[in-house]
Amino acid sequence: MLGMCRGRRKFVAASLALIFIPALTWLYLSSANITVKPLPLSPLDPQSSAVVGAAAEHQSLELRLRDVEEHNNALRREISRTPRVPTHSSHPSSSRHGNQLHTHSTEEGTGDSEAKKGAAAGNSSDCVPQPVVKKCETIHIAIVCAGYNASRDVVTLVKSVLFHRRNPLHFHIITDSIARKILADLFHTWMVPAVHVNFYDADELKSEVSWIPNKHYSGIHGLMKLVLTKTLPSDLEKVIVLDTDITFATDIAELWVVFHKFKGQQVLGLVENQSDWYLGNLWKNHRPWPALGRGFNTGVILLLLDRLRKLKWEQMWRLTAERELMSMLSTSLADQDIFNAVIKQNPFLVHQLPCYWNVQLSDHTRSEKCYKDVSDLKVIHWNSPKKLRVKNKHVEFFRNLYLTFLEYDGNLLRRELFGCPSETDHNSENLQKTLSELDEDDPCYEFRRERFTVHRTHVYFLHYEYEPTVDNTDVTLVAQLSMDRLQMLEAICKHWEGPISLALYLSDAEAQQFLRYAQGSEVLMSRSNVGYHIVYKEGQFYPVNLLRNVAMGQVNTPYMFLSDIDFLPMYGLYEYLRKSVVQLDMGNTKKALVVPAFETLRYRLSFPKSKAELLSQLDMGTLFTFRYHVWTKGHAPTDFAKWRTATTPYRVQWEADFEPYVMVRRESPEYDRRFVGFGWNKVAHIMELDAQEYEFVVLPNAYMIHMPHAPSFDITKFRSNKQYRACLKTLKEEFQQNMSRRYGFAALKYMTVDNNS
């Protein structure tokens, strides 16, 4: 009996071995993601298994696999009979993969860690679909911008947002009068589709926050985010608020969708402050405003405006500010201090954003803990007065990312979106209609098209501050230039002490080169009465007359001296022209005061300080009358022989191809935009002045000297390209016909004179 029991035990043990050993082996081999060397099917090592015959081994394996399959089927039937109890699995694979068979793998471990990261950031969800922004949903962005420097910063911010965006955008910009003028012109000429801009007067909001003492470098404008609920339209429900020193590295729609994650009474979306400022341990006796933990940074804010209004936000922040100012006396970080004080008292208001939505780069931040990889970056915040000079071990990477958008061609952002309906832009519609009417087979098509090209324009690129004199005699020098003429700026500033309006034709990258050049020049930085207006490059021609019109459009004095960048005016010309205004009764007559033009072929010239010195150099061959050897007709009517001995102003008559440099009233006609590049651009303007019955009066003691330079690209094309010259002639004839239609019978003389010549 004992022997029988032992025999049965051996039989059972053998049976179990035959069933479970192959089963475990099969499960091990069928693991999807762990690839290791397969175990032998018998306890023998590979050398001993080689002794077994191949046929017997194959048959044995087949039997074992069949047994394993039958065992698995039995298990499935048993499981199907067991009732399921719904539970919330904490395992990330449960929510991610539903009912899929999931094997343990290294991928699963990664998913688990990612889920933990998401939960820590407040972004975890169990089988809940992630919200998305609708294709054509408009994203609203609010920015406070004041002054010339902030206006430049806004452009870089907007570029980074436009580069990544896939949705229509609506910018709400709170500006002072300076920034409004700059940004209104910029957005108007930028013509980016599916972008709407509203401006709000910061001056009207000053009384709301001026009672708060503020030590922050942003000044009173740094407090205006507090009053957005009152400033922005009452029907606007939510908005993303951004500082001007922000750079986006992702689609802003990803941030917009976070609004869906707000719960309960959460109305503010903020990233935790990444410095120890609010911990009060940066230096001895440092006493910051109250904050929740490390506090929150207000460079990026998600505002639920409708809920804030219901919570009486205005009253809430005012009471908090008044209470804290009794002991703190002033804010150190502007609106951020007050936001944090409110949150300290009402922590339920805040929804904490993951820190990659506001990677703060200042000397005391620990922002490197927010990211391990480039893909982790969403928003970079240069929240230090040092900006790009801030200390950070990864600052070179961040700086390069910032410079990418700083120098990025903004014209490329004019791309159309994917069929989203938008309000009709009449300017864009009219432009497209005009361009469609042009004949693309016309040999002069590119010339004609250039006349209607809308160039992106950034007026007052640098700080400008000047009030015209009260006697109504003030004069602004007007000129235009490209990058290769920058070296003339300092010399002109030394010769002309009055206001200057300059239009610069530059690419985005060249504009930054110019900025660095100007900021490094003591001469240019000492002058606040020079307005620099950037017209961004587009097309193949130099839009010389557009540039002149842009510079003329920013003149705020009664008179303007229409010059060119290659000319140095005589010392004292500014005061001489102002005196001539009174002497010649310019305020009551239509006169164009002619300043005689000369030239030198020497790069180093002892500039004449008087008319006598100039005449001496003229006699010695150091100076010449301008273009005497290539274009005599251009300045011949000035009558240089008479000028040599003249002591009083004298009148001259218009002649064909006359193109003097003149001082006129600010209301004088603009230059005709059809003329681009080289040829007939000034001639046409002088012709129109004559048609409007301006008198040309030569000033006896005024002069200007043209300095030598390499030939421009456009004059080279004019000289070498026959089609260029043919198109210029065609445009000239069309201009003359247009003059006849506008000014009647008297204007026929321009066509007659030209035909005779």
UniProtKB/Swiss-Prot annotation:
Root EC class: transferase
Keyword Ion transport: no
Membrane-protein topology: Single-pass type II membrane protein
GO molecular function: glucuronosyltransferase activity; hexosyltransferase activity; manganese ion binding; xylosyltransferase activity
Disulfide pairings: none
Keywords annotated in UniProt: Coiled coil, Glycoprotein, Glycosyltransferase, Golgi apparatus, Manganese, Membrane, Metal-binding, Multifunctional enzyme, Signal-anchor, Transferase, Transmembrane, Transmembrane helix
Annotated compartments: Golgi apparatus membrane
Known pathway: Protein modification; protein glycosylation
EC assignment: 2.4.-.-, 2.4.2.-, 2.4.1.-
Gene Ontology terms: biological process: protein glycosylation; protein O-linked mannosylation; skeletal muscle organ development; skeletal muscle tissue regeneration
Lumenal topological segments: 32-757
SUPFAM superfamilies the UniProt entry points to: Nucleotide-diphospho-sugar transferases
Catalysed reactions, semicolon-separated: 3-O-[beta-D-GlcA-(1->3)-beta-D-Xyl-(1->4)-Rib-ol-P-Rib-ol-P-3-beta-D-GalNAc-(1->3)-beta-D-GlcNAc-(1->4)-(O-6-P-alpha-D-Man)]-Thr-[protein] + UDP-alpha-D-xylose = 3-O-[alpha-D-Xyl-(1->3)-beta-D-GlcA-(1->4)-beta-D-Xyl-(1->4)-Rib-ol-P-Rib-ol-P-3-beta-D-GalNAc-(1->3)-beta-D-GlcNAc-(1->4)-(O-6-P-alpha-D-Man)]-Thr-[protein] + UDP + H(+); 3-O-{(1->[3)-alpha-D-Xyl-(1->3)-beta-D-GlcA-(1->](n)-4)-beta-D-Xyl-(1->4)-Rib-ol-P-Rib-ol-P-3-beta-D-GalNAc-(1->3)-beta-D-GlcNAc-(1->4)-O-6-P-alpha-D-Man}-L-Thr-[protein] + UDP-alpha-D-glucuronate = 3-O-{beta-D-GlcA-(1->[3)-alpha-D-Xyl-(1->3)-beta-D-GlcA-(1->](n)-4)-beta-D-Xyl-(1->4)-Rib-ol-P-Rib-ol-P-3-beta-D-GalNAc-(1->3)-beta-D-GlcNAc-(1->4)-O-6-P-alpha-D-Man}-L-Thr-[protein] + UDP + H(+); 3-O-{beta-D-GlcA-(1->[3)-alpha-D-Xyl-(1->3)-beta-D-GlcA-(1->](n)-4)-beta-D-Xyl-(1->4)-Rib-ol-P-Rib-ol-P-3-beta-D-GalNAc-(1->3)-beta-D-GlcNAc-(1->4)-O-6-P-alpha-D-Man}-L-Thr-[protein] + UDP-alpha-D-xylose = 3-O-{(1->[3)-alpha-D-Xyl-(1->3)-beta-D-GlcA-(1->](n+1)-4)-beta-D-Xyl-(1->4)-Rib-ol-P-Rib-ol-P-3-beta-D-GalNAc-(1->3)-beta-D-GlcNAc-(1->4)-O-6-P-alpha-D-Man}-L-Thr-[protein] + UDP + H(+)
Region annotation (Xylosyltransferase activity) ranges: 139-414
Parts of the chain on the Cytoplasmic side: 1-10
Family: In the C-terminal section; belongs to the glycosyltransferase 49 family. In the N-terminal section; belongs to the glycosyltransferase 8 family.
Protein name: Xylosyl- and glucuronyltransferase LARGE1
Organism: Danio rerio (Zebrafish)
